Amino acid sequence: MAIHFFNEESKYKLKLKSELKQWIKAVAAEEGFKIAALNYILCSDEYLHQINVTYLQHDTFTDIITFDHSEKKDSIAGDIFLSTDRVIENAQSFKVSESEEMCRVLVHGALHLMGYTDKTKASKSTMTTKENYYLAKRTFDGK
C-alpha cells in the first residue's frame, strides 16, 4: 500500500502528505479497493501538455491524466499526473482554496483508477458526487 508524491517541473509544496495518504487509502477502502502502488506526479502545464500530446494525442491542456497499471480487480496501481498550474487557476475560478481543489483532483484521479469515468454528462455527474462526498469526509483541514 504505497502512495507517493513527486514533483516534475513544479515547485508546488504539497501539505499534509500523511493525512492525504490516509484519506486516499480510506476512499479506496470504502470503494472496495486496496492500493498497490499509487504515484501522484505534480507537474507544470507544459509538462502535462506534452504527456497529453505524446501518449493520448490530445493537443490540449488538462488538469489530470491517469495511467492505470492495476493488475487485480480489487487493487489499484497507477501514475496520476496533475498540473499544479491548473489546480491553482481552477481554485481561483471556482472560488475555493488551493488545498480543496488539490484534494478534489487527487481523489478524482484515484476514482478514475477505481473505474469511474467522466466522459458523459451522467458519468461526470456521478464522479462529481463521489468527489463531493469524499471531500466532505476529510478529517483534516484542507479547506
Predicted regions and their residues:
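An acidic/histidine-cluster motif and surrounding catalytic segment
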Residues: 1-103, 114-143
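Conserved ATP-binding N-box helix of the HATPase_c
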Residues: 111
